[in-house]
Amino acid sequence: MPFGKPLVGTLLASLTLLGLATAHAKDDMKAAEQYQGAASAVDPAHVVRTNGAPDMSESEFNEAKQIYFQRCAGCHGVLRKGATGKPLTPDITQQRGQQYLEALITYGTPLGMPNWGSSGELSKEQITLMAKYIQHTPPQPPEWGMPEMRESWKVLVKPEDRPKKQLNDLDLPNLFSVTLRDAGQIALVDGDSKKIVKVIDTGYAVHISRMSASGRYLLVIGRDARIDMIDLWAKEPTKVAEIKIGIEARSVESSKFKGYEDRYTIAGAYWPPQFAIMDGETLEPKQIVSTRGMTVDTQTYHPEPRVAAIIASHEHPEFIVNVKETGKVLLVNYKDIDNLTVTSIGAAPFLHDGGWDSSHRYFMTAANNSNKVAVIDSKDRRLSALVDVGKTPHPGRGANFVHPKYGPVWSTSHLGDGSISLIGTDPKNHPQYAWKKVAELQGQGGGSLFIKTHPKSSHLYVDTTFNPDARISQSVAVFDLKNLDAKYQVLPIAEWADLGEGAKRVVQPEYNKRGDEVWFSVWNGKNDSSALVVVDDKTLKLKAVVKDPRLITPTGKFNVYNTQHDVY
């Protein structure tokens, strides 16, 4: 990464003092930063000025505040205490000074902070503003409690006015919910005809879609913490309720334990750091629980421990909640929400995403900045193991398959390197391999967000969405599960889409219900053409390209059946 000649010595020396410059693989770490640095929906309400910081007009402060929450908050945190990125509090930034900070923002760091200036993403004037801004005390966004939730809550169609049976002719189990990130929408796509059924307005940049246990209700949550509940039984799939559970969020889930199907919905917020339990038919808020508290490693207080992945237990009437910065997994029992019980399991800091092993008993969850996978036994309600894996694991839900030697394994790819880690998951029949990294495959490179296979498939797909090499980010690696010693095959997904100019990042393999097709998003800029590409899983040949002007920045895709039944 180039540095301006007059600043080379000063900048590198300062970076060393800050502990930011190491000899890590720059491209792979840049991929991780690019992912974590996604725009935040947080908008603090007032201007803060700090002794010792450069003067800023109100308009300058507000402009810089907006840039920070679009570009920086995902890594450095809302309160700038540090998360994936380093702390940027005034005691540190004022000591470094304006010139150093401008150089840092312009050229980035060898550890992976993006080069906002030399890449052209921020102007010189914007960089000057940002260097001033981070020398001020961070403005704290407002809290979001029950009054705010209830004010945002809307029941658009009352439960008693909803249909008693499915009124449309859609093959619901093979329907896909596709995130249209920058449009603030989802597209419902028929998996058989490959046509868009309906585009529905949602919150900003939907992060995930989840199905209720019955398969009737689709729940989507935007990064602005807005949840939309969509009734798939209606004559035309229709939004029936919505609520905002905070200011920024990533996760939503529905109760799945026998006897409690569809009864409750839970969602977790990045800000304020909390989760909320709601009525499963109306989204009426019932309970809010803060996640602020002590970290699992140093037992120090953290003011901003964000809620990441949430998964519904099949063993108990519980939600399993990842708390990112504290490194704790919470078992939230919803048997009696008026007397809510929460069990805290210490795991490792920076818990993020994960999914079930093939038995649906063990929750395999990545602590991405700790380079570990935590194994949570949902039946015995305890930590079974912490497994060391590669750099910055990001499994999505992960991928389960049967290895010829090690038996059932769960696998994850990584943002920070090109490895794929395989972890044994069968303590009964293969105890010598259980909860150990039994093998490691090598893919195209770092920058992976998702890995996927299917019980009926003999292939394993690995994307590399945030790899800085366009040839890699625009393609996927496919491993033959019957011959893992063979080199992976590369599928030129973006080339098959034939879109012309643009980044054309390929993201998230997703199977159809039958497990014989794999769908990919070709994610282009908001003003460019994007597409969905469908691959025949048996032949690895192109089967279809879905193009439509309404497919604006498609990213995540969620097949109704596979999401409902945790098939991955």
Curated annotation (Swiss-Prot):
<dbReference type="GO" id="GO:0046872">
    <property type="term" value="F:metal ion binding"/>
</dbReference>
<keyword id="KW-0479">Metal-binding</keyword>
<dbReference type="Pfam" id="PF02239">
    <property type="entry name" value="Cytochrom_D1"/>
</dbReference>
<keyword id="KW-0732">Signal</keyword>
<dbReference type="InterPro" id="IPR009056">
    <property type="entry name" value="Cyt_c-like_dom"/>
</dbReference>
<feature type="binding site">
    <location>
        <position position="251"/>
    </location>
    <ligand>
        <name>heme d1</name>
    </ligand>
</feature>
<keyword id="KW-0408">Iron</keyword>
<dbReference type="GO" id="GO:0042597">
    <property type="term" value="C:periplasmic space"/>
</dbReference>
<feature type="binding site">
    <location>
        <position position="96"/>
    </location>
    <ligand>
        <name>heme c</name>
    </ligand>
</feature>
<comment type="subunit">
    <text>Homodimer.</text>
</comment>
<dbReference type="InterPro" id="IPR051200">
    <property type="entry name" value="Host-pathogen_enzymatic-act"/>
</dbReference>
<feature type="binding site">
    <location>
        <position position="397"/>
    </location>
    <ligand>
        <name>heme d1</name>
    </ligand>
</feature>
<keyword id="KW-0813">Transport</keyword>
<protein>
    <recommendedName>
        <fullName>Nitrite reductase</fullName>
        <ecNumber>1.7.2.1</ecNumber>
        <ecNumber>1.7.99.1</ecNumber>
    </recommendedName>
</protein>
<keyword id="KW-0560">Oxidoreductase</keyword>
<dbReference type="InterPro" id="IPR011048">
    <property type="entry name" value="Haem_d1_sf"/>
</dbReference>
<dbReference type="GO" id="GO:0009055">
    <property type="term" value="F:electron transfer activity"/>
</dbReference>
<feature type="binding site">
    <location>
        <position position="250"/>
    </location>
    <ligand>
        <name>heme d1</name>
    </ligand>
</feature>
<feature type="binding site">
    <location>
        <position position="270"/>
    </location>
    <ligand>
        <name>heme d1</name>
    </ligand>
</feature>
<feature type="binding site" description="axial binding residue">
    <location>
        <position position="76"/>
    </location>
    <ligand>
        <name>heme c</name>
    </ligand>
</feature>
<feature type="binding site" description="proximal binding residue">
    <location>
        <position position="207"/>
    </location>
    <ligand>
        <name>heme d1</name>
    </ligand>
</feature>
<feature type="binding site">
    <location>
        <position position="508"/>
    </location>
    <ligand>
        <name>heme d1</name>
    </ligand>
</feature>
<dbReference type="GO" id="GO:0020037">
    <property type="term" value="F:heme binding"/>
</dbReference>
<feature type="binding site" description="covalent">
    <location>
        <position position="75"/>
    </location>
    <ligand>
        <name>heme c</name>
    </ligand>
</feature>
<dbReference type="Pfam" id="PF13442">
    <property type="entry name" value="Cytochrome_CBB3"/>
</dbReference>
<dbReference type="InterPro" id="IPR036909">
    <property type="entry name" value="Cyt_c-like_dom_sf"/>
</dbReference>
<dbReference type="InterPro" id="IPR003143">
    <property type="entry name" value="Cyt_cd1_C_sf"/>
</dbReference>
<keyword id="KW-0349">Heme</keyword>
<feature type="signal peptide">
    <location>
        <begin position="1"/>
        <end position="25"/>
    </location>
</feature>
<feature type="binding site" description="axial binding residue">
    <location>
        <position position="113"/>
    </location>
    <ligand>
        <name>heme c</name>
    </ligand>
</feature>
<feature type="binding site">
    <location>
        <position position="109"/>
    </location>
    <ligand>
        <name>heme c</name>
    </ligand>
</feature>
<dbReference type="GO" id="GO:0050421">
    <property type="term" value="F:nitrite reductase (NO-forming) activity"/>
</dbReference>
<dbReference type="GO" id="GO:0050418">
    <property type="term" value="F:hydroxylamine reductase activity"/>
</dbReference>
<feature type="region of interest" description="D1-heme domain">
    <location>
        <begin position="141"/>
        <end position="568"/>
    </location>
</feature>
<keyword id="KW-0249">Electron transport</keyword>
<feature type="region of interest" description="N-terminal tail">
    <location>
        <begin position="26"/>
        <end position="54"/>
    </location>
</feature>
<keyword id="KW-0574">Periplasm</keyword>
<feature type="binding site" description="covalent">
    <location>
        <position position="72"/>
    </location>
    <ligand>
        <name>heme c</name>
    </ligand>
</feature>
<feature type="domain" description="Cytochrome c">
    <location>
        <begin position="55"/>
        <end position="140"/>
    </location>
</feature>
